[in-house]
UniProtKB/Swiss-Prot annotation:
Listed name of the protein: Threonine dehydratase, mitochondrial
GO cellular component, one term: mitochondrion
Keywords of this entry: Allosteric enzyme, Amino-acid biosynthesis, Branched-chain amino acid biosynthesis, Isoleucine biosynthesis, Lyase, Mitochondrion, Pyridoxal phosphate, Repeat, Transit peptide
Enzyme class: lyase
Misc. comment: Present with 11900 molecules/cell in log phase SD medium.
Cofactor list: pyridoxal 5'-phosphate
Primary location group: mitochondrion
Family, per entry: Belongs to the serine/threonine dehydratase family.
UniProt organism field: Saccharomyces cerevisiae (strain ATCC 204508 / S288c)
Record GO terms (molecular function): pyridoxal phosphate binding; threonine deaminase activity
Inducing stimuli: In response to starvation for tryptophan and branched-chain amino acid imbalance.
Regulation of catalytic or functional activity: Isoleucine allosterically inhibits while valine allosterically activates this enzyme.
EC number: 4.3.1.19
Length: 576
């Protein structure tokens, strides 16, 4: 036997109870066979687009090599890190912020887009590129194409806010507005790519895009002096390109670092898919953190995420708003909701998910993924931030509507600062009862120790015979109820429904057009959240015999909705 053969690695394979030795050459062939056997045809085709020296022995992408070979530094410098001084002090740990919000298009998306476009051959460059996006990916593709002098087309839904498509147009790309939603725009994008021979640049589900995003991990290890003390990196998750790239690199180079994904409760595509061990589409997806509002995680990104993600933390809107405020206080910069996801997840990981861990010995690195914040969202973020950080309480108080009752309630809340107080005399309630009339008060006030002070205030109110309910987590109260106090009415068979209306022409017309002539619209309150979605609360009087027809109307409408008829705020303030 030759020396060459002796040096080949051996692998033990069990077949039908018998063991056999497989040489190194045959091992490579076996791994390639297993790769084809266990992956979908679409993934095998995707991996085959890569060069041979960009693949591992099992024919899957070698992401460490792809990251090291990335072209992103032709167009950007490394994004800096910032010490989260305030966060570190409050959380009693070492927080270092990775500032992707400071890249040229204010988002990490430029990395993946540029890396893929830079690898196109001359014929592909001459034909041009196309992408479908109404957000950061669109700007990343446009910026990259302009830098490389490649024609680019960006397809966006018709309802895209003007500021977004104007930014893309300013970068030199042709903007095509098509369709009422992202799915229709995506279909048009695929059609144009086929007709014009354009190369489609996906937002996340391609090895070159993933590798471009993975350069973030390489920079973290270079920039953080005590990289050996990094306990976890917190990554916002939408389609999965960022977490796949960061995770694939870190788990090979610094496997001690945990990869923690962060999603919103209403867009938990990775969380749900990991639980079911397969990609799981979401029936509806929340849009507040619009940069991560994806119905289903990518196929390649999920394959990688299954191998590298240690945990996923879910957060809500209020927690995101509080994180935006935290970041502002540490950096004097305002990030978009998706950009604050990582900080919100880190805070929850420390305080709620893993309180048993000694976090004082760890360094945590949340990725601030972007800063494309719509200015008109700031009011909403500011309002909800205090709730997210537990510094404000919303309370519903029922007390006798007699002189002196309000004064007694205020004495209990004092010296806390009252931030809102709503009440209106309702003569109907007084006429309908022989008992002492009741007043329903909607109030909010500032607190330092939320749990302790809520308990204290409620006990003191109850001791006076007042009824108090904490409604800080009641979405109807926060979005609509506070603006409707005093408008109680007695409407037979009234149904109260909250909707998320798309901010586009015809949305209200479609809603009203579907109402039956026998249904009476009894309440309507709209509030814009500075996003592509507006929140609507509607009251509709529906005869009992038409309940099934009404339910079908709700389903066919296609808008996200919740039945709020039994909600405490409605029962106390809007109905008698």
């Amino acid at each position: 036997m030759s020396a060459t053969l002796l040096k080949q690695p051996l692998c033990t394979v069990v077949r039908q109870g018998k063991q056999s030795k497989v040489s190194g050459l045959n091992l490579l062939r076996l791994k390639a066979h297993l790769h084809r056997q266990h992956l979908s045809p679409s993934l095998i085709k995707l991996h085959s687009e890569l060069k041979l020296d960009e693949l591992q022995t099992d024919n899957t992408p070698d992401y460490v090599r792809l990251v090291l070979r990335s072209s992103v530094y032709d167009v950007i410098n490394e994004s800096p890190i910032s010490q989260g001084v305030g966060l570190s002090s409050r959380l009693n740990t070492n927080v270092i912020l990775k500032r992707e919000d400071l890249l040229p298009v204010f988002s990490f998306k430029l990395r993946g887009a540029y890396n893929m476009i830079a690898k196109l051959d001359d014929s592909q460059r001459n034909q041009g590129v196309i992408a479908c996006s109404a957000g950061n990916h669109a700007q990343g593709v446009a910026f990259a194409a302009k830098h490389l002098k490649i024609p680019a087309t960006i397809v966006m839904p018709v309802c895209t806010p003007s500021i977004k498509y104007q930014n893309v147009s300013r970068l030199g790309s042709q903007v095509v507005l098509y369709g009422n939603d992202f799915d229709e725009a995506k279909a048009e994008c695929a059609k144009l790519a086929e007709e014009r021979g354009l190369t489609n640049i996906p937002p996340f589900d391609h090895p070159y895009v993933i590798a471009g995003q993975g350069t973030v991990a390489m920079e973290i290890l270079r920039q953080v002096r005590t990289a050996n003390k990094i306990g976890a990196v917190f990554v916002p998750v939408g389609g999965g390109g960022l977490i796949a790239g960061i995770g694939a690199y870190l788990k090979r180079v610094a496997p001690h670092i945990k990869i923690i994904g962060v999603e919103t409760y209403d867009a938990a595509t990775l969380h749900n898919s990991l639980q079911r061990n397969q990609r799981t589409p979401l029936p509806v997806v929340g849009t507040f953190a619009d940069g991560t509002s994806v119905r289903m995680i990518g196929e390649e990104t999920f394959r990688v995420a299954q191998q590298v993600v240690d945990e996923v933390v879910l957060v809500n809107t209020d927690e995101i708003c509080a994180a935006v405020k935290d970041i502002f206080e540490d950096t004097r910069s305002i990030v978009e909701p998706s950009g604050a996801l990582s900080v919100a997840g880190m805070k929850k990981y420390i305080s709620t998910v893993h309180p048993e861990i000694d976090h004082t010995k760890n360094t945590y690195v949340p990725i601030l993924s972007g800063a494309n914040m719509n200015f008109d969202r700031l009011r909403f973020v500011s309002e909800r931030a205090v709730l997210g950080e537990g510094k404000e309480v919303f309370m519903l108080v029922t007390l006798p509507d007699v002189p002196g009752a309000f004064k007694k309630m205020q004495k209990i809340i004092h010296p806390r600062s009252v931030t809102e107080f709503s009440y209106r005399y309702n003569e109907h309630r007084h006429e309908s009862s022989s008992e002492v009339p009741k007043a329903y008060i909607y109030t909010s006030f500032s607190v330092v120790d939320r749990e302790k002070e809520i308990k204290q205030v409620m006990q003191q109110l109850n001791a006076l015979g007042f009824e108090a309910v904490d409604i800080s987590d009641n979405e109807l109260a926060k979005s609509h109820g506070r603006y409707l106090v005093g408008g109680a009415s007695k409407v037979p068979n009234e149904r109260i429904i909250s909707f998320e209306f798309p901010e586009r022409p015809g949305a209200l017309t479609r809603f009203l057009g579907g109402l039956s002539d026998s249904w009476n619209l009894t309440l309507f309150h709209y509030r814009n959240h500075g996003a592509d979605i507006g929140k609507v609360l509607a009251g509709i009087s529906v005869p009992p015999r038409e309940n099934l027809t009404f339910q079908k109307f709700l389903e066919d409408l296609g808008y996200t909705y919740h039945d709020e008829t039994d909600n405490t705020v409605y029962q106390k303030f809007l109905k008698y």
